[in-house]
Amino acid sequence: MDLVKNHLMYAVREEVEILKEQIRELVEKNSQLERENTLLKTLASPEQLEKFQSRLSPEEPAPETPEAPEAPGGSAV
């Protein structure tokens, strides 16, 4: 019985370490994405932010076909 218990404890410890590493990676990735999001918000024009916010509002359905992204400066070329 001790052999089974020891094996299970070892397997659980191993799995916990794997999960801890995955959590560390996900936290790091989340922080990176949050920094990127903040940077993009600061670089976006008020018109771009308004357009983005309108796409997120639940009253209006999102367009089925993606639009071409606008070039910096506000006009699509």
From Swiss-Prot:
Induction: By glucocorticoids in lymphoid cells and upon IL4, IL10, IL13 or glucocorticoid treatment in monocyte/macrophage cells. Transiently induced by IL2 deprivation in T-cells. Expression is up-regulated by synthetic glucocorticoid dexamethasone in differentiating myoblasts. This is TSC22 domain family protein 3. The modification N-acetylmethionine is found at M1. Residues 41-77 are annotated as: Disordered. Can form homodimers, however it is likely to function as a monomer. Interacts with AP1 and NFKB1. Interacts with MYOD1. Interacts with HDAC1; this interaction affects HDAC1 activity on MYOG promoter and thus inhibits MYOD1 transcriptional activity. It is found in: Cytoplasm; Nucleus. It comes from Sus scrofa. The leucine-zipper is involved in homodimerization. One of its GO terms (biological process) is regulation of transcription by RNA polymerase II. CDD domains: ZIP_TSC22D3. The keyword GTP-binding does not apply. The modification Phosphoserine is found at S45. Residues 19-40 are annotated as: Leucine-zipper. Residues 68-77 have a biased composition (Low complexity). Belongs to the TSC-22/Dip/Bun family.
